[in-house]
Each structure stands twice: as structure tokens, then as C-alpha cells.
Design a protein with these regions (language model features):
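Sensor-1/coupling segment of RecA-like P-loop NTPase cores
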Residues: 1-8
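Short phosphate-engaging motifs
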Residues: 3, 61-65, 140
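RecA-like P-loop NTPase motor core
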Residues: 9-125
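Generic alpha-helical structural element
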Residues: 54-58, 88, 92, 133, ...
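Residue-level signal for secondary-structure boundary elements
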Residues: 78, 152, 156-160, 234, ...
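Activity-critical C-terminal alpha-helical subdomain
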Residues: 120-205
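C-terminal, charge/polar-rich interaction regions
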Residues: 167-261
């Protein structure tokens, strides 16, 4: 096998014949993954049964949006459908600062180069260190709060969508459950500032609670955001960067990079 791997690495011409019992025929575009599969009489499903690419995120909110992003990509890009199952979103919350520290630590390079770090959109991608930032250029909750405010102020057709209407997500729902609470929170921040009290971390905590208390509603908001042409560049940027990292990480898990072409 090592000789085959060496030949493929050097891009030497290699003819591999598939034994089909009654006949033999050449394998098209032979690579080490296909050859191993046939030598061991395995199917593609067998080979990838226990193989995953770990995705580390900051929190549950990021994983929620990542699930919706993956669902969107599967419906939009046929080639993504076959690889989405290979990504494993690790159920652990790690701050952006700590994640960045781990993935940029040269001593841990051998470990981190086998995983992908997904930071919130208020950070920047660092492909060299296997870090990609979510689309939106802000934390997930902030992206959605800003977007729903925009839909409200512009009287967007979103509010007349039959699914939204049937779910009871009217403008009154937004005003009562989100807009008024945001207004009260902003007033509280002003009070803290006047009294010289710290407001550190309060906005993020407030946004997270608001998101989780209205998660079903914000799911529809994000789906609308995904289909808004204004956001296409950001959505495509994340897709392309994730693709680049997949190509870099896949071989470490014996996953054929050609699965996503």
C-alpha cells in the first residue's frame, strides 16, 4: 500500500484493475481511498462509518445557526449533501478567545489541524490555523436582532408570509416579545452608564436569552436572512472557506477530499 501511496503522491501513471469475478476493468481516476475500499471489499458507507471531522463552536446558538446553514447548503449545493454528515459539531462551549488560543498554539498544531474551528461572525477567519468565521460579521444573536429590526422598519413582505402568519409571528409578537424588551434593556444600559456601573457582558447575555426564549421565531428569521440576496456574498464566503478547510483536514481522517469537489 505504501508503494501505491507513493506513486499516487508523485502523480505517476497508475492502472488499477478491479476484479469483477468474471472480468476485470480499469478503475477510473484511481486514488488511495478507492483502492483501499476495493482491496478490503468495503462500500463507501463502510469506510466512512466512524470517520468524522470535528467542528468546534463557541456555543449552542452558533451550532443552531450552523445546522440551518448546513441545511441551506444541502438544498443549494448538491455536492455538499454527501459530505455534510461527515462534520461533527462538538457539544462543548468554548469562548472565542480560548478557541483562538488553542488553534493558534504551534505546540498543538498536530491536534488542531485535524479539526475546524468555527467562530462567530464578529471575528475573522484564519484559514492557516483552521479557523472560519460564521457569516454575518457579528455574533449570531446580534445578526438576527439587527435583521428582524430591519424587516420591521421596512415593513418587509416577511410579515405576510403564510407560514409566519400561521405560526402567529406577527408584528405584535415582535413588539411584545422582542422590541419592547430590547428598549428596556437599552434604557438599563444608560442607567448603568450614568451610575458608573459596569455593563460588561450584559448585552451578550441579554441577546442570548432573547434568542433562546424566541428560538423558533428566530429560526424563521435566519432562513429569511439566508435567502436574501444581500447576504449571498457572506454565505458563499463561509461555504468556500469551509470547503478549503475540508480539503486540508479530510486526509487526516482518511476521508477522500474528492468527496467534496
Amino acid at each position: 500500500m505504501s508503494l501505491l501511496e507513493e506513486m499516487l503522491a508523485k502523480k505517476d501513471n497508475l492502472l488499477y484493475l478491479i476484479d469483477n469475478i468474471t472480468s476485470a476493468f480499469p478503475m477510473e481516476d484511481p486514488d488511495i481511498y478507492k483502492i483501499k475500499m476495493h482491496l478490503q471489499s468495503l462500500t463507501q458507507e463502510d469506510i466512512y462509518e466512524d470517520k468524522i471531522i470535528p467542528l468546534f463552536t463557541e456555543d449552542d446558538e452558533a451550532r443552531c445557526l450552523l445546522d440551518l446553514l448546513f441545511d441551506y447548503y444541502q438544498k443549494t449545493y448538491v455536492e455538499f449533501g454527501s459530505v455534510s454528515r461527515l462534520f461533527h459539531k462538538v457539544l462543548i462551549n468554548i469562548s472565542a478567545e480560548n478557541l483562538t488560543g488553542i488553534f493558534t498554539d504551534s505546540k498543538l498544531l498536530h491536534t488542531t489541524m485535524r479539526s475546524i474551528c468555527v467562530l462567530d461572525g464578529d471575528h475573522k477567519s484564519d484559514i492557516t490555523n483552521f479557523i472560519v468565521a460564521l457569516p454575518g460579521k457579528a455574533a449570531p444573536e446580534a445578526v438576527l436582532l439587527n435583521y428582524i429590526k430591519e424587516l420591521y422598519n421596512n415593513d418587509d413582505p416577511f410579515w405576510k408570509n403564510r407560514i409566519i402568519v400561521d405560526k402567529g409571528y406577527s408584528k405584535n409578537y415582535y413588539i411584545t416579545n422582542i422590541k419592547n424588551l430590547v428598549g428596556d434593556f437599552e434604557a438599563e444600559l444608560v442607567r448603568l452608564h450614568k451610575n458608573g456601573e459596569s455593563s460588561k457582558g450584559k448585552r451578550r447575555a441579554f441577546n442570548k436569552k432573547l434568542f433562546n426564549d424566541n428560538q423558533n421565531f428566530f429560526t424563521f428569521v435566519f432562513k429569511h436572512w439566508l435567502h436574501n440576496k444581500v447576504n449571498k456574498a457572506e454565505i458563499d464566503r463561509f461555504y468556500n472557506e469551509l470547503h478549503t478547510l475540508f480539503l486540508k483536514v479530510a486526509p487526516y481522517h482518511e476521508i477522500n477530499p474528492k468527496e467534496w469537489t
